[in-house]
Amino acid sequence: MEQPYVYAYPQGSGPSGAPTPQAGGVVVDPKYCAPYPIDMAIVRKMMSLTDGNFVITDVNGNLLFKVKEPVFGLHDKRVLLDGSGTPVVTLREKMVSMHDRWQVFRGGSTDQRDLLYTVKRSSMLQLKTKLDVFLGHNKDEKRCDFRVKGSWLERSCVVYAGESDAIVAQMHRKHTVQSVFLGKDNFSVTVYPNVDYAFIASLVVILDDVNREDRAA
């Protein structure tokens, strides 16, 4: 069975030595916050049409999350499931908006009362990915709670706390023979201490949606 790629820092380096971001903390659920860095390995079977073709594991290969792909006719909705198949969050794209916008809800809900956060492009025309994240209580959206910047195609995106330079998660790509010949896209995401890794996993799903729309445009 294929072993997922996991990015590892040399001992004494990497995010474990970085200060904890002030804007970190719970977005989805406290159980997804750890006092140490979390490395998540992501494998996407790009040619697969089966449910759960987007898989996220921990460093030991244990399943953390999988994505329930939209059925035909419902391409604006995806669900992030935990390892047991229970909905963690539901992601829905709002089709009518000046800037592409995604809403993320708790569990399997799409009720506005269960809105956790909203994501939108920083601008309509972008050479590289720039997304702003607004938590559910941030109604006026004058200042973002998180930012995503980088290149999805190169799998080099970084998540920042608010408008600061404090990094809360970053992505690393891994090229393998299997990724080239078997149509699998392997990369990993390092989540910094005390940052909700279910939240970061759901951002990765949105980044994937953004990229697929850009390629289809």
Curated annotation (Swiss-Prot):
Select a single GO molecular function from the record's annotations and give it.
protein domain specific binding
Q: N-acetylmethionine modification sites?
A: 1
This chain belongs to the protein called: Protein LURP-one-related 15
Q: Which Gene3D superfamilies match?
A: LURP1-related
InterPro entries in the record: LOR (IPR007612), LOR_sf (IPR038595), Tubby-like_C (IPR025659)
Instruction: Output the Gene Ontology cellular-component terms.
Output: cytosol; plasma membrane
Which family does the record claim for this protein? Belongs to the LOR family.
